[in-house]
Regions:
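Ligand-binding loop in jelly-roll beta-barrel domains
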Residues: 78, 86-91, 100, 110-111, ...
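His/acidic/aromatic-lined binding-pocket segments of jelly-roll/cupin-type domains
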Residues: 83-84, 92, 109, 114-117, ...
C-alpha cells in the first residue's frame, strides 16, 4: 500500500535565531536561538527521519539511496532538494551561494539556488536582494571600502511575498521575518558582510570575500512572476519553475482530489488543519506538518477549510 512519508527533522541554532519556530508552529525548540528547521532534508548536516509507516526511523538519505523507486528512479545521485523554515530574529549575514560548477570544484558539493516564501514579517521588515555595482571591479571596490549603504539593495517585505534567489545573488534576510525556503540540497554559503558581529567567543565570523566576488552576479536579480489558477476549492499559484525545482502555493477551502503530475512531491503546511487521504487511509495534517508524497502515490485527497501549503518537486 502506498503511503506518505511524514518526517521528524532537525533544528539548527543560529546567532540570529529566535523562538518563532516554537511560537508560530509549536515545535519543541532546544534553545532561544533557533534559526532554522530543516523540515525536509537529506543533507548530512541535518537529515530528516521518516516518522510513520514501513520506513519509520529510516533517514531520508538512506531511503533515497536504497529505494530510488519511491522517487521515480530519477538521475540525481543524492536527494536534490531541502525545505527549511527560517526565523530571522536578527539580520542574517549578507551572503551569496555558488552555482553547481563552482560549488563542486571548490567545496565538493552542489551550489545553491533557492527561493523564499514570506510566512510572516514584522512591520518595516526588509531583505537585501541584489546590489548596485555595475562591474566586478566596482563590486570589489565597494566591498573593500565597506560602502554597504551604496552597494546593497534593500527591499521591504510582507507576508505572502515571494523571492527567487538564484545562485550568484547577493542576499540577506532581515530581522523580524519568518520564511519557508526551498533550495538545492547544499550548505555552502559565502559571507560578504556580517554587520561586524561577534560569536559567543568574541570572534568575528569568517568572511569569504574572494569566493564571493568570484560568484556574485552583476545586474538585477531575476525574480519570478507567480501565476494563479483557481478551481472550486483550490487556488494554485505557480511561484517559480526552473531547472532545479518547481514551487507552488496551494490554498484549499474544501475537499480537493489530486493526481500525480511529478515523480514525487514535498509538501509543507503553513496554515490551517485538515486531512490527507492516500489509498483510503486518512492522515491528520496541520500547520507545521511536512511530508513527501513518493512516486507510488498516484492520487490523493486534501481536505480542510483554510489550508495553505507550499509544494515543490524537482
Amino acid at each position: 500500500m502506498s503511503e506518505p512519508l511524514f518526517l521528524n527533522s532537525v533544528m539548527q541554532e543560529k546567532i540570529w535565531g529566535g523562538t518563532k519556530l516554537r511560537d508560530e508552529f509549536g515545535y519543541d525548540i532546544p534553545s532561544e536561538k533557533i534559526g532554522e528547521y530543516w523540515a525536509i532534508s537529506a543533507h548530512p548536516n541535518g537529515v530528516s527521519k521518516v516518522a510513520n509507516g514501513r520506513f519509520e526511523g529510516t533517514d531520508l538519505a538512506t531511503l533515497y539511496a536504497e529505494h530510488r523507486e519511491l522517487f521515480g528512479n530519477r538521475p540525481e545521485p543524492v536527494f536534490p532538494l531541502l525545505t527549511k523554515i527560517l526565523d530571522a530574529n536578527d539580520w542574517l549575514s549578507v551572503q551569496v551561494h555558488p552555482d553547481d560548477a563552482y560549488g563542486l570544484e571548490h567545496e565538493g558539493e552542489l551550489g545553491k539556488t533557492e527561493c523564499w516564501y514570506i510566512i510572516a514579517a514584522d512591520e518595516g521588515s526588509e531583505i537585501i536582494y541584489g546590489h548596485n555595482a555595475k562591474s566586478k571591479e566596482e563590486l570589489r571596490q565597494q566591498i573593500e571600502d565597506k560602502n554597504w549603504d551604496a552597494l546593497l539593495t534593500k527591499v521591504p517585505v510582507k507576508a505572502g511575498d515571494f523571492f527567487y534567489v538564484p545562485s550568484g545573488t547577493m542576499h540577506a534576510i532581515g530581522a523580524g521575518i519568518l520564511i519557508l525556503e526551498t533550495q538545492q540540497s547544499s550548505d555552502t554559503t559565502y559571507r560578504v558582510y556580517d554587520f561586524d558581529r561577534k560569536d559567543d567567543n568574541g570572534n568575528l565570523r569568517e568572511l569569504h570575500l574572494e569566493k564571493s566576488i568570484d560568484v556574485l552576479n552583476i545586474g538585477e536579480p531575476a525574480n519570478s512572476r507567480p501565476v494563479t489558477v483557481k478551481a472550486d476549492d483550490l487556488s494554485s499559484t505557480l511561484l517559480v519553475s526552473n531547472d532545479f525545482f518547481a514551487v507552488y502555493k496551494w490554498e484549499i477551502t474544501g475537499k480537493v482530489d489530486f493526481e500525480k503530475t511529478a515523480d514525487y512531491s514535498l509538501l509543507s503546511v503553513l496554515a490551517g488543519q485538515g486531512k490527507l487521504t492516500v489509498d483510503g487511509k486518512d492522515y491528520s495534517i496541520q500547520k507545521g506538518s511536512h511530508f513527501i508524497l513518493p512516486s507510488d502515490v498516484e492520487a490523493w485527497t486534501l481536505e480542510g477549510s483554510d489550508l495553505e501549503l507550499i509544494v515543490s518537486h524537482p
